[in-house]
């Protein structure tokens, strides 16, 4: 049936936006129109416009972890965001509303439910996200990335996390590792905003390694941190030996070429590592509002697909020692174990569900 429309709600970091784009692309290939509901400041403003998808922006940035004044401001913005969300739903008349997780889904999801629009919530982590917990009464389905506690409810459906098709089509680990020689190729990824602890530790760890044990390093810093990280490598005498990037625009290519990734343990990051079949050193972000990343890292490590390195245990000497002890046989084993955990085709399964709810 032609002329169907999906409203994708995702904002903030790449972990919400990139899987939303994967589902959007799949639905577009089936003839659907896509409209995006985001905010004025998140990464969606960088990633969505180049796709040609219309981006509607709410003046809302969340209320958790902002302090008293920030929380009050967020609460006022939230009230306005409910009205703005309703206006966008009336304007675009979506057949399905797709929430990718995070605070931006709250006003749009509530209004979708009140206006009798089918609402699909994507829960990337094993545990139930707070925003999704609040929205469950309004939801038609809760799509889960992992078979964890979030998947236990009556509305839950385990599909895996939507991953870009370019990553799912990366060659198998054995084919990629065949014939590789020379220094290990290591990719450091701190997420779309960068990771302070990785930015501070990697230059020191590289400096502690003898030249013959030093990997060929590509380090994604986050745009705001690029100059400081560049200065740290310069001070260590290593600037010319390291490729620095503020943001990775060609992640499928980078994953296919590297031997190891050092990164955080967000659900989408972990899902992409599994889809690509890439070994990793996972340094999860653990904050007062969530421990989802720690759970993800432990799950990967228990499966033999990654090394779990808690942030409080991360130091330059330890990381240098870990890197010095690696060889490609070890890395290939972990790469194949990661690939075995992948749930390929998740974007298609979420798109199938959207079509079912729209009556196709």
From Swiss-Prot:
Primary subcellular site in the record, as a coarse category: membrane
GO molecular function: UDP-N-acetyl-D-glucosamine:N-acetylmuramoyl-L-alanyl-D-glutamyl-meso-2,6-diaminopimelyl-D-alanyl-D-alanine-diphosphoundecaprenol 4-beta-N-acetylglucosaminlytransferase activity; undecaprenyldiphospho-muramoylpentapeptide beta-N-acetylglucosaminyltransferase activity
InterPro entries according to UniProt: GlcNAc_MurG, Glyco_trans_28_C, GlycoTrans_28_N
Entries under Gene3D superfamilies matching the protein: Glycogen Phosphorylase B
Reactions this protein catalyses: di-trans,octa-cis-undecaprenyl diphospho-N-acetyl-alpha-D-muramoyl-L-alanyl-D-glutamyl-meso-2,6-diaminopimeloyl-D-alanyl-D-alanine + UDP-N-acetyl-alpha-D-glucosamine = di-trans,octa-cis-undecaprenyl diphospho-[N-acetyl-alpha-D-glucosaminyl-(1->4)]-N-acetyl-alpha-D-muramoyl-L-alanyl-D-glutamyl-meso-2,6-diaminopimeloyl-D-alanyl-D-alanine + UDP + H(+)
Known pathway: Cell wall biogenesis; peptidoglycan biosynthesis
Annotated residues for binding of UDP-N-acetyl-alpha-D-glucosamine: 13-15, 164, 192, 293
Topology of this chain in the membrane: Peripheral membrane protein
GO biological process: carbohydrate metabolic process; cell division; cell wall organization; lipid glycosylation; peptidoglycan biosynthetic process; regulation of cell shape
Keywords assigned by UniProt, alphabetized: Cell cycle, Cell division, Cell inner membrane, Cell membrane, Cell shape, Cell wall biogenesis/degradation, Glycosyltransferase, Membrane, Peptidoglycan synthesis, Transferase
Location of the protein in the cell: Cell inner membrane
Ranges that cross the membrane: none
GO cellular component terms, A-Z: plasma membrane
Record-listed E.C. numbers: 2.4.1.227
Its job: Cell wall formation. Catalyzes the transfer of a GlcNAc subunit on undecaprenyl-pyrophosphoryl-MurNAc-pentapeptide (lipid intermediate I) to form undecaprenyl-pyrophosphoryl-MurNAc-(pentapeptide)GlcNAc (lipid intermediate II).
Family: Belongs to the glycosyltransferase 28 family. MurG subfamily.
PANTHER family per the UniProt record, alphabetical: GLYCOSYLTRANSFERASE, UDP-N-ACETYLGLUCOSAMINE--N-ACETYLMURAMYL-(PENTAPEPTIDE) PYROPHOSPHORYL-UNDECAPRENOL N-ACETYLGLUCOSAMINE TRANSFERASE 1
UniProt-listed NCBIfam families: murG
Protein's name in the database: UDP-N-acetylglucosamine--N-acetylmuramyl-(pentapeptide) pyrophosphoryl-undecaprenol N-acetylglucosamine transferase
Provenance organism: Chromobacterium violaceum (strain ATCC 12472 / DSM 30191 / JCM 1249 / CCUG 213 / NBRC 12614 / NCIMB 9131 / NCTC 9757 / MK)
């Amino acid at each position: 049936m032609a002329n169907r429309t999906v409203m994708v709600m995702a904002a903030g970091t790449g972990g919400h936006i990139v899987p939303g784009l994967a589902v959007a692309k799949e639905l577009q290939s089936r003839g659907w129109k896509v409209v995006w509901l985001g905010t004025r400041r998140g990464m969606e403003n960088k990633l969505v416009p180049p796709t040609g998808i219309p981006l509607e922006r709410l003046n809302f940035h969340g209320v958790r972890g902002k302090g008293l004044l920030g929380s009050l401001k967020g609460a006022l913005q939230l009230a306005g965001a409910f009205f703005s969300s309703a206006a966008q739903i009336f304007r675009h008349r979506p057949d399905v509303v797709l929430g990718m997780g995070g605070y931006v889904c709250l006003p749009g999801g509530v209004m979708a439910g009140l206006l009798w629009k089918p609402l699909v919530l994507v829960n990337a982590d094993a545990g139930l996200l707070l925003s999704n917990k609040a929205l469950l009464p309004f939801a038609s389905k809760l799509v889960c990335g992992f078979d964890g506690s979030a998947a236990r409810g009556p509305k839950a459906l385990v599909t895996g996390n939507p991953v870009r098709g370019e990553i799912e089509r990366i060659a198998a680990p054995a084919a990629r590792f065949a014939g590789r020689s020379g220094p290990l190729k290591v990719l450091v990824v701190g997420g779309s905003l960068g990771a302070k602890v990785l930015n501070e530790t990697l230059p020191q760890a590289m400096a502690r390694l003898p030249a013959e044990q030093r990997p060929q390093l590509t380090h994604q810093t986050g745009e705001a941190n690029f100059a400081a990280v560049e200065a740290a490598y310069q001070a260590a005498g290593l600037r010319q030996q390291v490729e620095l990037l503020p943001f990775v625009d060609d992640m499928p290519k980078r994953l296919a070429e590297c031997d190891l990734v050092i990164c955080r343990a967000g659900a989408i990051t972990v899902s992409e590592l599994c889809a690509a079949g890439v070994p990793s050193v996972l340094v999860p972000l653990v904050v007062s509002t969530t421990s989802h990343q720690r759970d993800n890292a432990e799950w990967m490590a228990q499966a033999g697909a990654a090394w779990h390195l808690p942030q409080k245990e991360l130091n330059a000497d330890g990381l240098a020692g870990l890197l010095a002890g690696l060889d490609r046989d070890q890395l290939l084993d972990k790469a194949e174990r990661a690939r075995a955990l992948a749930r390929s085709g998740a974007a298609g399964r979420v798109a199938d569900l959207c079509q079912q709810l729209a009556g196709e």
